[in-house]
Swiss-Prot record:
GO terms for cellular component: chloroplast stroma. Monomer. Gene3D superfamilies: 1.10.8.1070, P-loop containing nucleotide triphosphate hydrolases. The keyword Transcription regulation does not apply. InterPro entries: ATPase_AAA_core, P-loop_NTPase, RCA-like, RuBisCO_activase_AAA_helical. The keyword Oxidoreductase does not apply. It is found in: Plastid, Chloroplast stroma. This is Ribulose bisphosphate carboxylase/oxygenase activase, chloroplastic. One of its GO terms (molecular function) is ATP binding. It comes from Chlamydomonas reinhardtii (Chlamydomonas smithii).
């Protein structure tokens, strides 16, 4: 006959044998069992003295590995969030490129160069010194950064991103330390089994010398020296004041710029930096423009004519041209709404202002394209800064600075 005890009072007081059984079970639960090798290795990567992580980004690694009682909650009120600098790091440093939609053109030569560079840096090639840095340089507005973003997304890489503005600081040595920190953050991601890369935008603008008008600071010198040191020792990158003989995964570095001749010459030598001049061909320009006008029902033949009409313009010229076409519609909306009421419609309205698609035929695009070219020529011709009080010419060929299609 089996007796079921429903309460602890019955099991602990009324039945003596049950109390003894309960105590024996509790003693069995409190016995210390020697951990197996599998259990010891389970925590090996985050043990003190073994974990080489620079920050507290990874405090969530113990999630679902320990008892729920000792797990902090996630979310705004939780305590199991990476708090040190991880929110800024996730939102500013690491780019996911989830906002890039399919349909954009990637130059085959550009993708080939980036893919080979990243693959070579992750390979163990015998007795071959692979340059750690890939320097992509070329004219302004040619889509270097966007092509890099498309290539990264194609490769499934979420890189650690830095900009030229982070290469200068009021404190000496801060930018060099930041480069090392970001490099080690990317190395930590690779250590966990995911590809990563360090991506530096406009390196020449932050670390180069732009003539005699700019001052060469200690930080400029330290940035160049730090990149040289990392390129020579990519698996031994230490933070200032920390000297541990440890080996970290190698992180390929990709940087963009307009003129690498402004950089420190030993940095851009062939053993440290592989240089790639990005000059899009006619097919590249047509392919990129097809992505720009993909939602406007512009035919390929019209895009080819548009590119041939403005052969000397950069690729971002055509993006600005597409935005310029909406000027007439926005001007008409402002007229209908009233200048004094547009704030209520644009900021405080419950529904956003929706504009219908503008018909973009070749004639309209060429018309607005010529107006953009005229503005460029005005800047070159007037040069107001050189002769500000010397009777500079008015903008426009006819002496009018009024926008096109404006009527008094």
């Amino acid at each position: 006959m089996q007796v079921t005890m429903k309460s602890s009072a019955v099991s602990g007081q009324r039945v003596g044998g049950a109390r003894v059984a309960t105590r024996s079970v509790r003693r069995a639960q409190l016995q210390v069992v020697a951990p197996s090798r599998k259990q010891m290795g389970r925590w090996r990567s985050i043990d003190a003295g073994v974990d080489a992580s620079d920050d507290q980004q990874d405090i969530t690694r113990g999630r679902e590995m320990v008892d729920d009682l000792f797990q902090g909650g996630f979310g705004a009120g939780g305590t199991h969030n990476a708090v040190l600098s991880s929110q800024e790091y996730l939102s500013q440093s690491r780019a996911s490129f989830n906002n890039i939609e399919d349909g954009f053109y990637i130059s085959p030569a550009f993708l080939d160069k980036m893919t080979i560079h990243i693959a070579k840096n992750f390979m163990d090639l015998p007795k071959i010194k692979v340059p750690l840095i890939l320097g992509i340089w070329g004219g302004k507005g040619q889509g270097k950064t966007f092509q890099c973003a498309l290539a990264y997304k194609k490769l499934g890489i979420a890189p650690i991103v830095m900009s030229a503005g982070e290469l200068e600081s009021g404190n000496a040595g801060e930018p060099a330390k930041l480069i090392r920190t970001r490099y080690r953050e990317a190395s930590d991601i690779i250590k966990k089994g995911r590809m990563c890369s360090l991506f530096i935008n406009d390196l020449d603008a932050g670390a180069g010398r732009m003539g005699d008008t700019t001052q060469y600071t200690v930080n400029n010198q330290m940035v160049n020296a730090t990149l040289m040191n990392i390129a020579d020792n990519p698996t031994n990158v230490q933070l200032p004041g920390v000297y541990k003989n440890e080996e970290i995964p190698r992180v390929p570095i990709v940087c963009t710029g307009n003129d690498f001749s402004t950089l420190y010459a030993p940095l851009i030598r062939d053993g440290r930096m592989e240089k790639y001049y990005w000059n899009p061909t006619r097919e590249d320009r047509i392919g990129v423009c097809m992505g720009i006008f993909q939602e406007d029902n512009v035919q390929r033949r019209e895009v080819e004519n548009l590119v041939d009409t403005f052969p000397g313009q950069s690729i971002d010229f055509f993006g600005a041209l597409r935005a310029r076409v909406y000027d007439d519609m926005v001007r008409q909306w402002i007229t209908d709404t009233g200048v004094d009421k547009i704030g209520q419609q644009l900021v405080n309205a419950r529904q956003k202002v929706a504009m219908p698609k503008v018909s973009m035929d070749l004639n309209v695009l060429i018309k607005y394209g010529k107006s953009l070219v005229d503005e460029q020529e005005n800047v070159k011709r007037v040069q107001l800064a050189d002769a500000y009080l010397s009777g500079a010419e008015l903008a426009g060929h006819g002496g009018s600075s009024l926008p096109e299609a404006y009527s008094r």
